[in-house]
Curated annotation (Swiss-Prot):
Expressed in roots, leaves and flowers of mature plants. GO terms for cellular component: membrane. PROSITE patterns: SUBTILASE, SUBTILASE_ASP, SUBTILASE_SER. It comes from Arabidopsis thaliana (Mouse-ear cress). Residues 120-671 form the Peptidase S8 domain. Residues 21-124 form the Inhibitor I9 domain. GO terms for biological process: proteolysis. This is Subtilisin-like protease SBT2.5. Residues 397-501 form the PA domain. Induction: By methyl jasmonate. The keyword Glycoprotein applies. Keywords: Glycoprotein, Hydrolase, Protease, Serine protease, Signal. It is an enzyme of class 3 (hydrolase).
Length: 815
């Protein structure tokens, strides 16, 4: 190789190493907001809450024009081969994603016509019985024609890890075939191996987006699949929660754990894969997926995804390519549900911030999988387990994993985890109950209960016990289905009782080797769930408010999360090759937790509301869900939230709107809310333009809109909640409600607040005809400065039975 060629190769390698993905937004409106003005191109803008007519010649021509402009600026600035354009964004934002060097990114930043240049950043996943818990089969589905029609003709788009199309939760109906779906125009990719489409009548769209992942060197086609195939499990699970078929038998290991159903079992599924097994995803791919989903005509977007960290160039949480794209989606009439994040129970851990998004927190529902271990001394130890019992009226010998090793030298494998059957003496284990240790390896995923089950079965054990000897804050113990008797003892004191009994009953020689095993026990039946009334509760991991307006963590005048939905131990479809949860590798269903599971609950319920009220805006649907939610649990008490005590033990405390938003979703009430707090694109711009610290220049960069909208204070944004982060003296905020009932109704308005802040409403009552809109005001005055937020609510009680409630949060300051 001559010296010149060698230098060239080194130069190319350096460019490849230093190049990164950047998202560039341009001057000029995207399709959704272009009102004309460029020579030869007629307007394509839609009114607020209207879908884009992608079949229109005007849209097609303008889309080509935008893409040519993207190509032109790259071609003018850089030599061919020194960059790669990954996507053109045309529908919701005007811009593109490109793989360029930092120097080229700086050149773009200074180029005429460029609004912003953001370095791409990563996103992550935010990881049955709940239809009954939410009252869907008896109170909601019948209003839409039963489960056979629940969600009919509504398309839910999932930006996630793909789908396993062969699962029965996603099968086409033959008894009641689906009809045509003229408003949806998405396409279906083929499986590159089988050449079969990923779609059927249930799955109506399936595409994948991985250009940014490939450019970053993160994509592995062997495990990530260059297709909509789910290589993780997460995407199949979330799709089934929202829109999986009804009545699918949930069978594992020869046992049935009930029947699975989505919230809207007749809704159609559109798949936009942008998340992957090992690395999560990249915003450039996610934005492309959202842009395509709205272009295709989805009605609802379910996002169980959130940013790892903000882009370095972003000053505010509300303005970046991701949130700006979602603002465009909402302008096009698409309802967006996004997971709140799993950073709880600590404050300001949300990863979903903007007023146009419905941010969903996770609740624990009324189901627990409890079990017990009965010892030979008569003591009964509580634990958890999804397993059958040992034979009745019989005790089995207990043998510790460390006492039945073939060779003590295998201790380097951490044998007490019971992950490797070959290190144990089968003769000593067979017919007995194997005692294993629940170490930190289970927490980080290098050990799994599934492997404990496999080890115990291979050795012929009568069952197994997992003992927790110490626990750190945040350790999550979830029951895992087992084909053999098994139990997890999560209480450290109970574990010590078992260990003490075992040691006292076991005879050893002077070297410590066991001479005889005399400890005995039996495992109870853990297959059936135990229902309780202290539900719902806010899950420990669910991210908490207050919401933040910038990455200095200054509080925003907007309440988040918005609403609470089930997100703990949720049964739903899984893909056999999914690895997101090691306990469910190779399984068809999984029982997992996260705000990732809560968001599709709201997406599915929003589909039911959309089905009944097809003309409602995303804000109207959000309002209906929030104002009819409940802050009372099944026992009639105020909602509680899991929290850490001073000793770092998990305890329950009184929950606040920073935990649950407006409250726990009540689907049947959301179908008939009485009043709605509506908002549109101009209202969202008004919120941005009046939020302190956000410059008009930055707003124009991401929305191509001047700040001609002034609502005086961001707290005046017409949200179904009120948040004032800096209340000094007296402040009045206004809200506007619309009667969506079919009859005239008179509402009495009342308000209450914690003592440090006085609250008044005006007028105290108002009458609204069907379709009429009225305004009321809420005045708050600081009585005393406590340094903590005060919580309250405004209630509107209708003469015909409607009850509307919005939460109020305010932080008083001295003048």
């Amino acid at each position: 190789m001559d010296i010149g060629l060698r230098i060239f190769v080194v130069f190319v390698l350096l460019v490849a190493v230093t190049a990164e993905v950047y998202i560039v937004t341009m001057e000029g409106d995207p399709i959704i907001s272009y009102k004309g003005g460029e020579n030869g191109f007629e307007a394509t803008a839609v009114e607020s809450d209207e879908k884009i007519d992608t079949s229109s010649e005007l849209v097609t021509v303008y889309a080509r024009h935008l893409e040519r402009k993207h190509d032109m600026i790259l071609g003018m600035l850089f030599e061919e081969g020194s960059y790669k354009k990954l996507y053109s964004y045309k529908h919701l934002i005007n811009g593109f994603a490109a793989h360029v060097s930092p120097e080229q990114a700086e050149t773009l930043r200074r180029a005429p016509g460029v609004r912003s240049v953001d370095k791409d950043w990563k996103v992550r996943r935010l990881t049955t019985h709940t239809p009954e818990f939410l009252g869907l089969p008896t109170d909601v589905w019948p209003t839409g024609g039963g489960f056979d029609r629940a969600g009919e003709d509504i398309v839910i788009g999932f930006v996630d890890s793909g789908i396993y199309p062969h699962h029965p939760s996603f099968a086409s109906h033959h008894r009641l075939p689906y009809g045509p779906l003229p408003h949806y125009k998405g396409k279906c990719e083929e499986d590159p191996h089988t050449k079969k489409s990923f779609c059927n009548r249930k799955i109506v769209g399936a595409q994948h987006f991985a250009e940014a992942a490939k450019a970053a060197g993160a994509f592995n086609p062997d495990i990530d699949y260059a297709s909509p195939m789910d290589g993780d499990g997460h995407g199949s699970h979330t799709a089934a929660i929202a829109a999986g078929n009804n009545g699918i038998p949930l069978r594992m290991h020869g046992y049935e754990f009930g029947k699975a159903s989505g919230m809207a079992p007749r809704a159609r599924i559109a798949v936009y894969k942008a998340l992957y097994r090992l690395f999560g995803g990249f915003v450039a791919d996610v934005v492309a997926a959202i842009d395509q989903a709205v272009h295709d005509g989805v009605d609802i977007l379910s996002l169980s995804v959130g940013p790892n960290s903000p882009p370095t160039t972003t000053k505010t949480t509300f303005l970046n390519p991701f949130d700006a794209t979602l603002l465009g989606a909402v302008k096009a009439g698409v309802f967006v549900a996004q997971a709140a994040g799993n950073g709880g129970p600590f404050p300001k851990t949300l990863v979903s911030y903007s007023p146009w998004i419905t941010t969903v927190a996770a609740a624990i529902d009324d189901r627990r999988y409890k079990n017990h271990l009965t010892l030979g001394n008569g003591k009964m130890l509580a634990g958890m387990g999804l397993s059958p019992p040992t034979r009745p009226h019989r005790l089995y010998t207990l043998v510790s994993a460390n006492d039945v090793l073939l060779d003590s030298s295998v201790s380097k494998y951490n044998p007490s985890d019971c992950q490797r059957p070959e290190v144990f003496n089968k003769k000593l284990v067979e017919g007995n109950i194997l005692l294993c240790g629940y170490s930190f390896n289970f927490v980080v995923g290098t050990a799994s209960i599934k492997k404990v089950v496999a080890t115990a079965k291979h050795l012929g054990a009568a069952g197994f016990v997992l003992v927790v000897e110490n626990v750190s804050p945040g350790t999550k113990f979830d029951p895992v289905p087992s084909a053999i008797p098994g139990i997890l003892i999560t209480d450290v004191s109970k574990s010590m009782d078992l260990i003490d009994y075992y040691n006292a009953s076991t005879s050893r020689d002077w070297t410590g080797r066991v001479k005889s095993f005399k400890a005995e026990g039996s495992i109870g039946d853990g297959l059936a769930p135990v229902l309780h009334k202290s539900a719902p509760q806010v899950a420990l991991f669910s991210a908490r408010g207050p919401n933040t307006k910038d990455f200095s963590f200054q509080d925003a005048d907007l309440l988040k999360p918005d609403i609470l939905a089930p997100g703990y131990l949720i049964w739903a479809a899984w893909c056999p090759n999914g690895t997101d949860e090691p306990n469910y590798v190779g399984e068809g269903f999984a029982l997992i937790s996260g705000t990732s599971m809560a968001a599709p609950h709201i997406a599915g319920i929003a589909a039911l509301v959309k089905q009944k009220h097809p003309q409602w805006s995303p804000a109207a649907i959000k309002s209906a869900l929030m104002t009819t939610s409940t802050v009372i649990d099944r026992a009639g008490r105020l909602l509680q939230a899991q929290q850490y005590s001073d000793t770092e033990a998990v305890t329950l405390v009184k929950a606040t709107p920073f935990d649950y938003g407006s409250g726990h979703v009540n689907p049947s009430a959301a179908l008939d809310p009485g009043l709605i707090f509506d908002a549109g694109y101009e209202d969202y711009l008004g919120f941005l333009c009046t939020t302190p610290g956000i410059s008009a220049h930055e707003i124009r960069n991401y929305t191509n809109t001047a700040c001609n909208y002034d609502m005086k204070h961001p707290s005046n944004f017409n949200a179904p909640s009120i948040a004032v982060s800096h209340l000094v003296g007296t402040q009045t905020v206004t809200r506007k409600v619309t009667n969506v009932a079919e009859v005239e109704e008179t509402y009495t308005i009342t308000a209450r607040m914690q003592p440090s802040i006085a609250i008044e409403v005006n007028p105290p009552a108002m009458t609204l005809r069907p379709g009429a809109t009225r305004t009321f005001s809420v005045t708050m005055t600081v009585r005393s400065v406590s340094g903590v937020y005060s919580f309250g609510e405004v209630k509107l009680k209708g003469s015909r039975g409607h009850k509307v409630r919005i939460p109020v949060v305010a932080l008083g300051h001295r003048r």
